Amino acid sequence: MSKRKAIPKKVRQSVYLMYNGHCAYCGTEIAYKDMQVDHATPLRIGGADDIPNYMPACRSCNHYKATLDIEGFRDYLSRLHKRLMRDSIPYQVAERFGIVKYVSDDVKFYFEELRGGENGTME
């Protein structure tokens, strides 16, 4: 397996500015030094290694998205509540006492909110 080439600084800066220093997925503000460049369509399923396929991501979103495409990541996130209710007693207790509140399985990413619900990456 070949090692991936580093993304040039100017390209990283362009990716960072796509969403004004926010994670394209969750919308969290991220410091430039902490931004990870994600491939919206993973390389392993034919995604390109270029700017139209890059998304600025926080460490957490990049970790959990891993090699999923955007719809796969959406599906993963939409199932989290059921999984937490099944597997996490502290989560169950927190929900019972109103500390956390279940809102919806409908996952809308930050980049979609900015673009009026349109799926896909910046072009």
Where are these regions (language model features)?
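Short cysteine-rich loop/turn motifs with clustered Cys
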Residues: 7-35, 58
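Short, intrinsically disordered, charge-biased short linear motifs at domain edges
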Residues: 6-14, 41-48
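Solvent-exposed, flexible loop/coil residues
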Residues: 34, 47, 113-115
